Each structure stands twice: as structure tokens, then as C-alpha cells.
Design a protein with these regions (language model features):
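N-terminal cap/leader regions of alpha/beta-hydrolase-fold enzymes
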Residues: 1-168
Length: 168
């Protein structure tokens, strides 16, 4: 297996048809691949988050992280974008789910996509991964130490769903 990959900033269609920034990494070798949506933490779409996405590509996955703060502070440094998002009250749950759905649709469109998709989030992104997994069809979900996940279950949350791994 080759560990060669390509990583780049792209535009995807998010909630409400909005065009949002995302960072994608994918292996160069041909083959059938699962896709993973990585959801960033409150400090945002930073260098460390992009490194997680690159590591997934090295391990054979198509991976993308949508910039959830694209609307509040387009092109801003991660810390400034995070501050703008916090000042606006954070990312609304409905918009988050729509942006993640857009990321999945992007992954689905890639050559070699095998139709299997997972979502991973860390810190506040862990909460977001949980919410996305409750609302969208994922084959796997990982919540990496997301705190204060929900006060009440999201409306329409299935009573039975695939296991969610919570790392704390």
C-alpha cells in the first residue's frame, strides 16, 4: 500500500446550499475506499485538525473536514474564526448537520467511494459528531471526549442505532 496522498482546500455545498470551505485528503492509489468526515474542535479548522485528515488519507480513507466557521469569518485565521463563531452563539445544530451532510455527499462523489461513511469529532466536534450520527446515516461514529453532549435527545433520534464510540 502506498502512503502517497493529495490534500487540498476545496469548496463543498453545505447547509441551505451555502458554499463552504473544506479541507480534503485522499490517497493517490486507486481502490475502493470508505469516507470519513472529521469535525473540528472549537478552536477551529486549524493545522492540527488538517493533520488528522491527512493521517486518515495515509491509512487509505477519503477524508474531509468542513470549516464550520466559513460563514462567520471567511478566510480568517482559525482563532479569529472561532471567536466570531462563539460571538454569534456557536454553530447551530441544524446548520452543523447540513454541513456534515454536504461533506458526506462530497465524499460519495469521489472516484472509488464505496458507500461506507464515518464521522469523527474531538472536543466540541465530538458533540457535533454525536448529533450528526443521530441525524444522518453513518456506518461508524466516534466522539473523542465531547462533553455536555445533549441535554435532551435530538428530535427523531432513533431508539436503536449503530454503536457510537466515546473516548474520554
Amino acid at each position: 500500500m502506498s502512503d502517497a496522498f493529495i490534500a487540498e482546500t476545496i469548496t463543498i455545498t453545505g447547509h441551505g446550499g451555502d458554499e463552504i470551505e473544506a479541507y480534503r485528503a485522499m490517497p493517490l492509489a486507486e481502490g475502493s475506499r470508505g469516507g470519513i468526515v472529521w469535525i473540528h474542535h472549537m478552536p477551529g479548522y486549524d493545522r492540527e485538525t488538517k493533520e488528522f485528515v491527512r493521517r486518515l488519507a495515509v491509512n487509505g480513507y477519503h477524508a474531509v473536514v468542513p470549516n464550520l466557521y466559513s460563514r462567520e469569518a471567511p478566510g480568517a485565521a482559525p482563532d479569529d474564526a472561532a471567536a466570531a463563531a462563539r460571538a454569534a452563539g456557536g454553530v447551530p445544530d441544524e446548520r452543523l448537520v447540513g454541513d456534515v451532510a454536504g461533506a458526506v455527499e462530497h465524499l460519495r462523489s469521489l472516484p472509488g467511494a464505496n458507500g461506507k461513511f464515518g464521522v469523527i469529532g474531538h472536543c466540541s466536534g465530538g458533540r457535533h459528531a454525536y448529533l450528526a450520527a443521530c441525524s444522518l446515516q453513518f456506518d461508524a461514529a466516534v466522539d473523542c471526549y465531547g462533553a455536555f453532549i445533549v441535554e435532551d435527545p435530538p428530535e427523531g433520534m432513533p431508539k436503536a442505532m449503530k454503536p457510537i464510540l466515546h473516548l474520554a
